[in-house]
Amino acid sequence: MGSEMCIRDSCYTMYMQQNNDVLFNLLDSHDTERLMNRFHDLDKFYQQLAILFTLPGSPCIYYGTEIAMEGAHDPDCRRCMPWSEIESKENQEKIAMMRKLIMLRRNEKMCRSPHFHFPDTYENDRCVEYIKLDEEGNQIEVLLNASEEKVKVKGNGKILFAREFDGEILGVNGTLIRRI
């Protein structure tokens, strides 16, 4: 497990900090398959967005991603926005989730901070945890369960964003962001 953490840390530190600060981060675009098309799973979809909104740089959301719009490689990824469906309950729930992530990034300084590390708390190699810190020492934990097993969450903190989390167990493809 330790060697994987070294690889994760070294990938980020290979670049000068001024480069990391101005990264333009995107998960889908007019030239790529849409994010939802890759997973066909909302929990995995929101895991990816949680990473996007908590890493250094500027998150970029392609139109339609806020409603988990599907689309294969170009030109299918350039489908028209389904405006007639935007008010549906399902789409409004997805938009609300996106707003939560946007507000989290806006309101929690740690989400925008370039300072983070991988503490190696969990035995499961498919459970990714990183801690974001701001200049005052405030911290948030981002925990993603990409394994096929549920994970018992260690410690506690104020939950800022969660999917597939019951207060103790992080489910398969679950996401937890909390202030610690």
Task: Please report, for each region that a protein language model flagged, where it lies by residue.
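Conserved alpha/beta catalytic core and glycan-binding cleft of carbohydrate-active enzymes
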Residues: 1-4, 8-74, 142, 146
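Carbohydrate-interacting/catalytic domains
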Residues: 8-9, 56-61, 65-180
